[in-house]
Amino acid sequence: MDSISLENFRELQSAGVQVIDSRPTVLFSERHIRGTIGISINGSFEYMANAIFKKAEKLILISLNERLSESFLRLEAEGFTDVVYFDISLWFEAGLDSSLVSRVSASSASKYLEKIVDVSNSEDWEVLHVKGVSNVPLVDIVKNPNKIRQDSVLYCGNGHKSMAAVSYLLTKNIITTDITGGLSAMLVDSPDLEI
């Protein structure tokens, strides 16, 4: 599939067309285009797409080449049919500004306990979560971003929904931090946390 041009991408983004970046969370966190939303193909891709984006609206997709067809097909299966592809290397090669996501390691999570919010589905939260931490699922964040305070530290099971939440909140000027690897990593690297 051919990429739209850099000029076309900038025009569409300026016009309010939302951008899905389906690259792995580590790549998105280290370097992405401001205003794009990271929903990794490696996570609950369909759930996150449906939670954040409207099927009737045009979308721009950023993806690794080897996962491009899969990303398109999975979006199409969910009813997202007006999707165009943008090759992010065009942005980077042009030397344009890129953004990063603030992250903290799972081993340091206990330092942020008063700021931590679990953005997992409520069903997953009921099964397993950090003791004393509140739950605001991704779908609820999209409905009302102000449920999350500035400087909150977000996590989910494996770090995919929390990256989606952090990047979505950035588009609403709410700055938060992601815990790398989510609860799975905290169970291993932060044994002092009560689960």
Task: Enumerate the predicted regions with their spans.
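C-terminal accessory/connector segments of nucleic-acid motor ATPases
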Residues: 1-14
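Short secondary-structure boundary micro-motifs
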Residues: 2, 20-23, 118
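A general structural motif
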Residues: 2, 17, 40-42
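Short, compositionally biased "basic patch" segments
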Residues: 13-28
